[in-house]
């Protein structure tokens, strides 16, 4: 995770990503981009971004404009929005590191992110009684102002409590991927956690957008 537009993040992030990739790591970068009203910082960020993207398997652009828009929609302080970014990354790490009923691993992620085009991380959380609201939150969650319509690849993990049913998984997955390319490669996982009772969480890596 880095903030572009200043000195340290802009100067070091691309090199750190390059070194990590040299060691065989799967490199997932999340880059915060400055407001449009900050032309100098925007210029610095634009110069740094190509190096970071070239050395990352997935590079998620986080627009401060989009973050502020999300906050207005949710009627929250926009600075609290940084917590959403952490939730995105935490959700992905949990997906890959935890044992589930249907497991996902790094090979699954590599299969998805190797699709041509951009990629993004998506997360949505809500009540298990209203799975459609989870999908709606997930579709509105990207912080880099992209659309998942026509996406070519999707790795999706559904997390829930012991009350999660097969119908929850089917409804969430089918609804979420309905706007993607008909030939979209979809890899699905599922995980049960006692902490998620009464709730559902959808975590997805969407590529080829």
Which residues fall in each region the model found?
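Tubulin/FtsZ superfamily GTPase core signature
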Residues: 1-209
């Amino acid at each position: 995770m880095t903030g572009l537009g200043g000195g340290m993040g802009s100067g070091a992030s691309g090199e750190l990503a390059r070194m990590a990739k040299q060691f065989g790591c799967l490199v997932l970068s999340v880059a915060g981009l400055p407001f449009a009203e900050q032309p100098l910082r925007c210029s610095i960020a634009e110069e740094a971004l190509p190096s970071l993207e070239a050395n990352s398997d997935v590079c998620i652009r986080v627009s401060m404009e989009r973050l502020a828009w999300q906050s207005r929609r949710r009627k929250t302080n926009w600075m609290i929005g940084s917590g959403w970014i952490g939730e995105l990354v935490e959700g992905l790490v949990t997906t890959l590191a935890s044992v589930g009923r249907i497991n996902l691993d790094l090979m699954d992620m590599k299969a998805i992110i190797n699709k041509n085009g951009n990629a993004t991380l998506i997360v949505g959380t809500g009540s298990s009684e209203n799975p459609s609201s989870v999908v709606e939150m997930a579709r509105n969650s990207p912080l880099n102002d992209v659309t998942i319509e026509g996406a070519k690849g999707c790795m999706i993990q559904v997390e829930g409590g012991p009350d999660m049913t097969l119908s929850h998984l089917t409804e969430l997955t089918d609804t979420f991927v309905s706007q993607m390319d008909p030939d979209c490669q979809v890899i699905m996982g599922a995980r049960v956690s006692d902490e998620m009772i009464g709730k559902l969480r959808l975590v997805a890596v969407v590529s080829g957008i």
